[in-house]
Amino acid sequence: SNTPQECGKELTQMYESNVNDVLISCGGGELMCEILPYVDFDRIKAAKPKWYLGYSDNTNFTFLQNTIADTASVYGTCAGAFAMKDWHQALVDTFDVLRGKGCKNNNGVVEKQVHGSDTWERESLKNEENPAPQYNLTEKKILRKYVGGDECDTEIAFEGRLVGGCMDCLVNLTGTSFDKVKEFNERYADDGIIWFLESCDLNVFAIRRAMWQMDNAG
């Protein structure tokens, strides 16, 4: 809730600060892209790496933290959810990752096993009287696996660098001066890239257009 210039300056300063180990966004939102010209990514890249946690519009930083600063980020729940009385396992896993709890060093690669969930929330129970409710897990998770264009029912295993975020933000970044995806892909071609994508406001056809645009932009 400040000017883009001040927000970009504050984010850079807080990332460089020695008085915190992690930055957790208070929530998603709109127009975080406007602060990017005022974030000093050279200073971000030179700073001691730290976790940045957030989702949705926070893609504007979590994704660029990966592709520009070569630093891992956490695409996940924002600060408000941690006020939940009884934490869902997803919150426990997230907090453990931030603290390094349960992590193992496997030949220089830090590993942490996290849990999936069989259900998901369609409608939140959040309101003014209850700003941090339990997740309203009413919907069953359905996973469908494809190899190329063909659906399959066999086990699939793959590995690589996991990058992505909110497609609304990613397609907005495509082709801008902040788009360093080609360089990132080339740098880590031997590792392989695993994309995770979610959509906020895009309808089915907008999603297809976004996928087409990102694919043809490299």
Spans of features found by a protein language model:
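Structural motif
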Residues: 22-24, 53, 194-196
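Conserved anion/nucleotide-ligand pocket segment
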Residues: 72-168
